[in-house]
């Protein structure tokens, strides 16, 4: 026999690791065969007289409910036949089949019995499958039923999804029979949500009244309980008075009349609105509209004008709204507490100290605001810390450095520290808690100087000047910079523009506008910077242009109805009613 070759390396043990992928499937299949043949079964589940043979160990491995039953001290742990009540026998058989096969079919005919059974047996996977099935079945005609079903069986995720679906599709849901059959508690749960997707609060009121009139005899006792969740202060005045206030059911209930009176006070007392805020004055999120731009007064065709128009960027339309009671050129405009203030100006003959206030909810101007202590045109107006500031201007005799501020709570103006320089045609802006007065004219020549007011110290101090002298310029705060555009220097109308960085106390140029614009309005609307109207040295302008900071470019984007020089601009959120009166 030949020699046997022996390696010098130490021997390694022979080993092969194997995990069978077929084994679990084969084992379950064979266990199910045993069950079908009633072999080695040690328990019978009796549901409504139907006897289902099974193995305790399989049921316990799959269901915490059965595990607690068979491994604890319950009487069922010693029984060979266990009766389970309040569960559908077909659903139980499907679930026990699943324990042996890992397969189940959920369909419209069984989901309503399968989900409660899965909840009882604590089969989380089947609960999830049933909920997923119901999510896919959601539509405006059944979402309320599915929502109630989910709530009954504590299916939080399905309840959340059904709620979200109901809120998003409320305009269709309110037309369904399910809606008319809602218990009062579920109705309140739905209409109290901030997420309710409606075009206006009028739709919510109409839905509530349709629900009420479906069964007036039983439901009229709940009218006040339900109406307190309708946000009546957000209704249009016409609808509030003509529809809500005249409804016989509403008029016959004292608590409902109080809700209507509350809404009327909110609409009729705009200055008091900051003190009247609450759940009923909060707009629902889906109905919150974007910002709109107002162009107020100005000079056109050789005379001051009273006209006012507003621009909606979503539609790119300019529409006329109620005019002011007086013609005003060189008017100062600002928004305080969702109301638009027009301060001073010149009516073509006289310098003005009167103020008008516009309420977009009613499309009306009111003249009950206290006048400024001085007549002012070419005045700068801005809001800081809840006060309205009037800065500089001219009174027909001299250029002013006077500054005063308006307290809407007291309806009173009071003087604060004057500027260090007299300024007419001044632009003002608020940034970082300071009030900036930018450029203008001292009565002799245009200015490039800038000063800012600290309300904590009641003091003005100079900051870095602009690179260009500018009077009758436009300015606005955009992305934490102060932008100054257009105006007029010693010689001509300007198209140039620059911006101020408060962190470096420096000005830097940006690209010029497409047109020269003196007496231009500048405002930020929905995150975009708009330059409005003005005078180019030859003609009064009705064009507007918008600035893109990413490309550092201006582009024209439409025209106003009126040409405007020295008009004011203000930005407000559009009213929350479908039938607002613009």
UniProtKB/Swiss-Prot annotation:
GO molecular function, one term: actin binding
Keyword field contains Repeat: yes
BACK domain boundaries: 143-245
Entry keyword set: Actin-binding, Kelch repeat, Repeat, Ubl conjugation pathway
The keyword Cytoplasm is annotated on this UniProt entry: no
Kelch repeat start and end residues: 292-338, 340-386, 387-433, 435-480, 482-527, 528-574
Cited function: Probable substrate-specific adapter of an E3 ubiquitin-protein ligase complex which mediates the ubiquitination and subsequent proteasomal degradation of target proteins. May have a role in synapse differentiation and growth.
Location of the BTB domain: 41-108
Region (Disordered): 1-22
GO terms under biological process: negative regulation of synaptic assembly at neuromuscular junction; protein ubiquitination
Source organism, top-level taxon: Eukaryota
InterPro entries, sorted: BACK, BTB-kelch_protein, BTB/POZ_dom, Gal_Oxase/kelch_b-propeller, Kelch-typ_b-propeller, Kelch_1, SKP1/BTB/POZ_sf
Pathway(s) the chain acts in: Protein modification; protein ubiquitination
Classification via SUPFAM superfamilies: Galactose oxidase, central domain, Kelch motif, POZ domain
Gene name of the record: dbo
PANTHER family xrefs: KELCH PROTEIN, KELCH-LIKE PROTEIN 20
Name this polypeptide is given: Kelch-like protein diablo
């Amino acid at each position: 026999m030949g020699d046997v070759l022996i390696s010098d390396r130490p021997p390694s043990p022979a080993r092969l690791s194997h995990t069978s992928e077929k084994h679990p499937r084969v084992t379950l299949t064979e266990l199910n065969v045993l069950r079908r043949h009633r072999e080695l079964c040690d328990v019978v589940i009796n549901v409504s007289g139907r006897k289902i043979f099974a193995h305790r160990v399989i049921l316990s491995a799959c269901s915490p409910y059965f595990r607690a039953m068979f491994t604890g001290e319950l009487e069922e742990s010693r029984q060979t036949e266990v009766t389970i009540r309040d569960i559908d026998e077909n659903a139980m058989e499907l679930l026990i089949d699943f324990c042996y096969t890992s397969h189940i079919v959920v369909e419209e005919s069984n989901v309503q019995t399968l989900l409660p059974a899965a909840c009882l047996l604590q089969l989380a996977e089947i609960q999830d499958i049933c909920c997923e099935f119901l999510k896919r079945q959601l539509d405006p005609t059944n979402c309320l039923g599915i929502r109630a079903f989910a709530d009954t069986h504590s299916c939080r995720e399905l309840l959340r999804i059904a709620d979200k679906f109901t809120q998003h599709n409320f305009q269709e849901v309110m037309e369904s029979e399910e809606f008319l059959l809602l218990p009062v508690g579920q109705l309140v749960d739905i209409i109290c949500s901030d997420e309710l997707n409606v075009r206006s609060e009028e739709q919510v009121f109409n839905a509530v009244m349709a629900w009420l009139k479906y069964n007036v005899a039983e439901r009229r006792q709940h009218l006040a309980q339900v109406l307190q969740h309708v946000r009546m202060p957000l209704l249009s005045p016409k609808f509030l008075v003509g529809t809500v206030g005249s409804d016989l059911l509403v008029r016959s209930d004292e608590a409902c009349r109080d809700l209507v009176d509350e809404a009327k006070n909110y609409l009729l007392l705009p200055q008091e609105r900051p003190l009247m805020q609450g759940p009923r004055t909060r707009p629902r999120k889906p109905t919150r509209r974007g910002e709109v731009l107002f162009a107020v007064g100005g000079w056109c065709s050789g005379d001051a004008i009273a006209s006012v128009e507003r621009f909606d960027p979503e539609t790119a339309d300019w529409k006329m709204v109620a005019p002011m009671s007086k013609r005003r050129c060189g008017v100062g405009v600002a928004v305080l507490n969702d109301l638009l203030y027009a301060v001073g100006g010149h009516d073509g003959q006289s310098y003005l100290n009167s103020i008008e206030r516009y309420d977009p909810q009613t499309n009306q101007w009111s003249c009950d605001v206290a006048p400024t202590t001085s007549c002012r045109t070419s005045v700068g107006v801005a809001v800081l810390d809840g006060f309205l500031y009037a800065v500089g201007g001219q009174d027909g005799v001299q250029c002013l450095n006077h500054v005063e501020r308006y307290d809407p709570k007291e309806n009173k103006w009071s003087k604060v520290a004057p500027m260090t320089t007299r300024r007419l045609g001044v632009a003002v802006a608020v940034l970082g808690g300071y009030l900036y007065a930018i450029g203008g004219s001292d009565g002799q020549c245009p200015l490039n100087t800038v000063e800012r007011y600290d309300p904590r110290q009641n003091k003005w101090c100079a900051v870095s000047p602009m690179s260009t002298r500018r009077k009758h310029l436009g300015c606005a705060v955009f992305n934490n910079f102060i932008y100054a555009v257009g105006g007029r220097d010693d010689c001509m109308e300007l198209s140039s523009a620059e911006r101020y960085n408060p962190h470096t106390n420096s000005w830097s140029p940006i690209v010029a506008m497409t047109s020269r614009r003196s007496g231009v309005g500048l405002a930020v609307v929905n995150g975009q910077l708009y330059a409005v109207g003005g005078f180019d040295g030859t003609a009064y302008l009705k064009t507007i242009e918008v600035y893109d900071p990413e490309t550092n470019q201006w582009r024209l984007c439409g025209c106003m109805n009126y040409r405007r020089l020295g008009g004011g601009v203000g930005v407000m959120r559009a009213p929350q009613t479908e039938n607002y009166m613009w």
